[in-house]
């Protein structure tokens, strides 16, 4: 949309890995993100974005990106079937071990 105007463009960078920005246009496009240094040397991000679809509905995605990767959340994303009980139990065991500091190299 060539006629879209910028409504918000705010940026803050602390210079130490902490930052925040927010951007919005008159045609319904919006994004915001904050970043912090991660405990394992990575950058951690948390944010969201939205934009209008051709049918007039709004697509919206929020996300976290950290040492566990990019984790989006949206009603637009497909959802797989639930994990079988035995797989769920294995995931719980793995999470317990991770919390205890157990690693397998």
UniProtKB/Swiss-Prot annotation:
Q: Which PANTHER family match?
A: CUTICLE PROTEIN, CUTICULAR PROTEIN 65AU, ISOFORM A-RELATED
Q: Name one GO cellular component term.
A: chitin-based extracellular matrix
Q: Give the region (Disordered) as residue ranges.
A: 1-21
Tissue specificity statement from the Swiss-Prot or TrEMBL entry = Arthrodial membrane.
Name the record gives this protein = Cuticle protein AMP2
Matching PROSITE patterns: CHIT_BIND_RR_1, CHIT_BIND_RR_2
Q: What are the Chitin-binding type R&R domain coordinates in residue numbering?
A: 16-81
User: A Pfam family in this protein?
Assistant: Chitin_bind_4
GO molecular function list:
structural constituent of chitin-based larval cuticle
- Ribosomal protein in keyword set: no
The question of whether Hydrolase is a record keyword is answered with no
Q: Which UniProt keywords apply?
A: Cuticle
